[in-house]
Amino acid sequence: MTFTQHFNSATLLKKKIIDDKLCFLEFKVENWKGHIPGQYSEICLTAENGYQAIRPYSIASTPQKDTVSFLIEKIDEGEVSNFLYDYSLAGDKFQISNPIGLRFILHNIKTPIFIASGSGIAPFLSMSKYLQEKKLSFFTYHWSRNITGLINFDEYFLRLNKYYFPFITREIPVGWKGGIERIKEENFNNLDINQGYEIYICGSDSFVEKALSVISNLSLDSEIYTERFGS
């Protein structure tokens, strides 16, 4: 592959293992000029024999930073995610694309609602950091199989409090006071049906379809935007 201006050279600065599936990667990217919350970039791996593999990942970092971060979920037989999780080291070189996509960006005209499953929280990490800096309100609903999958749980719980709703569906820790059920209409009883919202949903295809079904029954004044794994 001959790279165009679409891709830039990048150096891995930091790698943080979260659990047996998730990790954060932070890169320094040449000519990085920031992004709009909700955009993604493509990460390219190049083998010694010239073989290349490219995968898209939502940008999880604050838009104003001169570095860019991604939340990586290790997928069974995932060519890129397995390498990034298992073998990448600080100092490694990659190619990372300029920010892509305007379909799932933060509009911030009405009150945002973020609905995520698992690593689908990634674009909302960027969006929420931006909104917190602007001191603007938003709601976050996050479903995870375990406590470690609730990325930034302590920070969210401290800062957002009544606007943050975490759910654990499998490995429920002792003393857990959050939700334990899968997504249903009752989870959103705290929303004011007379207020306008912009709703963002990110997760697996089955989760997004279920969330759309639930939201459609709430009769909210809202615009809905979706992002699905692999789409």
Regions found by a protein language model. Name each.
Residues 3, 77-231:
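FNR/FR-type flavoprotein reductase catalytic core
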Residues 2-90, 145-146:
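Ferredoxin-reductase
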